[in-house]
C-alpha cells in the first residue's frame, strides 16, 4: 500500500533500476507518516561515507507530538540497504549522469519502506516526447471507448 509517491521523478528522469530500502525514523515520524503527512516531491538521495541518506523529505509533525521532542520536519534520514546493493549503487552513481531519487513510500509487512530509483535525467525534448505519448494514449483510449459504444449501439 503506497503512502506517498514522487510523480515528478517519473517526469524528470528515466528510471533504470528500482531498490526497496528501509528508513530510520523517530516515533513521531512514524505516527505522522501513518496519517499521510509526508511529501517526497522535493526529496533526493545522496551517498556519503558508504551510507545512503534521504534529504528533503518533508514529514509534517502531528499537533499532538510530544513536548519534550523537537520535531524537525526536513531532517536527513538514513536509508537501509545491504552493503552489496550500496556498493553497486555507488559504482553506478559515480558514472556521469546517474542519480538516486525516491519514487515511493509504502508499507511492507507493517514496516515503512522507500523505493529508490537509479535514474538518468531527461532532456527537455524527452519530457515533451513523453507528454505527447501520454496524451496520445489517453486519446486512443477515449476513441476506443467511443468506437465500442457505437458498435454496441448498432
From Swiss-Prot:
UniProt xrefs under Pfam families: SmpB
One Gene Ontology term, aspect cellular component: cytosol
General function of this protein: Required for rescue of stalled ribosomes mediated by trans-translation. Binds to transfer-messenger RNA (tmRNA), required for stable association of tmRNA with ribosomes. tmRNA and SmpB together mimic tRNA shape, replacing the anticodon stem-loop with SmpB. tmRNA is encoded by the ssrA gene; the 2 termini fold to resemble tRNA(Ala) and it encodes a 'tag peptide', a short internal open reading frame. During trans-translation Ala-aminoacylated tmRNA acts like a tRNA, entering the A-site of stalled ribosomes, displacing the stalled mRNA.
Gene Ontology molecular-function annotations: RNA binding
GO biological process: trans-translation
Membrane-spanning parts: none
Domain of life: Bacteria
Protein family per UniProt: Belongs to the SmpB family.
Record keywords: Cytoplasm, RNA-binding
Protein's UniProt name: SsrA-binding protein
Localization, UniProt: Cytoplasm
InterPro entries named among the record's database cross-references: SmpB, SsrA-bd_prot, SsrA-bd_prot_CS
Species: Methylobacillus flagellatus (strain ATCC 51484 / DSM 6875 / VKM B-1610 / KT)
Amino acid at each position: 500500500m503506497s503512502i506517498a509517491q514522487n510523480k515528478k521523478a517519473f517526469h524528470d528522469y528515466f528510471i533504470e533500476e528500482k531498490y526497496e530500502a528501509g528508513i530510520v525514523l523517530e516515533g513521531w515520524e512514524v505516527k505522522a507518516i501513518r496519517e499521510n503527512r509526508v511529501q517526497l516531491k522535493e526529496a533526493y538521495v545522496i551517498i556519503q561515507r558508504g551510507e545512503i541518506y534521504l534529504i528533503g523529505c518533508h514529514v509534517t509533525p502531528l499537533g499532538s507530538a510530544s513536548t519534550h521532542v523537537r520535531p524537525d520536519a526536513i531532517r536527513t534520514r538514513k536509508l537501509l540497504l545491504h552493503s552489496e546493493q550500496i556498493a553497486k549503487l555507488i559504482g553506478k552513481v559515480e558514472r556521469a549522469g546517474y542519480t538516486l531519487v525516491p519514487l515511493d513510500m509504502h508499507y511492507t509487512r507493517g514496516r515503512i519502506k522507500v523505493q529508490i530509483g537509479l535514474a538518468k535525467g531527461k532532456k527537455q525534448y524527452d519530457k515533451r516526447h513523453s507528454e505527447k505519448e501520454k496524451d496520445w494514449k489517453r486519446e486512443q483510449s477515449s476513441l476506443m471507448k467511443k468506437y465500442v459504444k457505437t458498435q454496441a449501439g448498432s
